[in-house]
Amino acid sequence: MPRKGPAPKRPLVNDPVYGSQLVTQLVNKVLLKGKKSLAERIVYGALEQARDKTGTDPVITLKRALDNVKPALEVRSRRVGGATYQVPVEVRPDRSTTLALRWLIGYSRQRREKTMIERLANEILDASNGLGASVKRREDTHKMAEANRAFAHYRW
């Protein structure tokens, strides 16, 4: 096993249009096969649609959506004496943001709208209103953690 320790976190540059690191993270998560300009077009288009539909700042809408999707608890597998338990643990803030973005994009890709811009915009709007598949995923994660609360003493 390598002994160098974890790789250092690299600083994220602010997004050129909105000046937000959150938008930069979103662009990097939408990115597929190195096509960053396409990812930027999708994200900016989705944020513009969100602005048109709500009439508010799209970064605020995105933050509200992420707050509704971010998990506070998750379960992690822990093997104890031949049995594997699902142990509920708290989620670090950076991981909760990453998970929220991943779920938001994953469920927007599964939606039925015609373009990815529409899908992402509608998923962001749904999440900001407390609806949508990504919010349901968070609720399911919390339910799973609550159901396995008995194993919380196995935390590490």
UniProtKB/Swiss-Prot annotation:
Keywords assigned: Ribonucleoprotein, Ribosomal protein, RNA-binding, rRNA-binding, tRNA-binding
Xref: InterPro entries: Ribosomal_uS7 (IPR000235), Ribosomal_uS7_bac/org-type (IPR005717), Ribosomal_uS7_CS (IPR020606), Ribosomal_uS7_dom (IPR023798), Ribosomal_uS7_dom_sf (IPR036823)
GO cellular component: small ribosomal subunit
A matching Pfam family: Ribosomal_S7
SUPFAM superfamilies in UniProt: Ribosomal protein S7
GO biological process assignments: translation
Keyword Membrane belongs to the record: no
CDD domains with a match to the protein in the record: uS7_Bacteria
Entry keyword Cell membrane: no
Gene3D superfamilies according to UniProt: Ribosomal protein S7 domain
Single GO molecular function: rRNA binding
NCBIfam families, per database record: rpsG_bact
Subunit structure: Part of the 30S ribosomal subunit. Contacts proteins S9 and S11.
Function: One of the primary rRNA binding proteins, it binds directly to 16S rRNA where it nucleates assembly of the head domain of the 30S subunit. Is located at the subunit interface close to the decoding center, probably blocks exit of the E-site tRNA.
Family: Belongs to the universal ribosomal protein uS7 family.
Name used for this protein in its record: Small ribosomal subunit protein uS7
Species this protein is from: Mycobacterium tuberculosis (strain CDC 1551 / Oshkosh)
